[in-house]
Amino acid sequence: MNKLILLAFALMSTVAMHAQREKWKVADKGPSIDNYFTPATAEAATPDNEGFIRRWTLLEPIDKPNRGNTVFTDSYLRENLGMEYFKGQFSILPKNGQKVKAGKQKLQWHTLDSKLYNVKLFRFATGLDKQFYGIIFWAVTVIECDEDIPGVRLSVGSNSASMWWLNGNETLLLSGDRRMVADDCMSQRITLKKGTNILRGAVINGPGMSDFCVRFIDENGTPVKNIRIK
């Protein structure tokens, strides 16, 4: 019995790696992207009841083949997520429908509201009939504050590894082959400044599902809700 289980696991791994190499698209997409996302409206959003940010501008996946996720060390992530794949990667404020070129790929940004607290990147990719293994997802959101909010922490869960920048500064790194768990990692204390704050994230995965969740936690461990999301 154990041999059969090991054989089945090996076969599944082989299929996953072959799918990644060949950049298979999904034959049976399963649930529609509409089950997970709605187009963002012009009106600013707010965090949900638990403080999770659901409005994001997501870039269609960038091709980044990896046979497995054990390579996602701190140094690997800083090198491969810190490099520029498209012009203005760390400076532009992307708009819905805007297009960029990453290598030979022409990719489009989509501004969406997630129906779940965790943003289902895998379903975002399959719903658009895009590559879903061996990829990097870029996510950007704009946070508006009426006043400085000091002493908060950026709290993230991601599948698999990810890296996050607030207002251009590296704020949090989630390395290794990991599952998405809410509040899996938290940053040092930071300040959400009065006015506009820009949060950028990059999520990388080889074979496997991809998603993330983000919120800010104050010094008392309470989710920050007095912000607007654009």
Segments predicted by a language model, with ranges:
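Non-cytosolic beta-sheet module surface loops
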Residues: C145, L154-S158, V203-N205
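Short structured motifs
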Residues: R123-G127, W138-V140, D183-S187
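Bacterial Sec-dependent N-terminal signal peptides
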Residues: M1-R21
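Beta-strand-rich ligand-recognition modules
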Residues: L166-V214
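Generic structural detector for well-ordered beta-strands
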Residues: F52, T57-E60, V142-E144, R189-T191
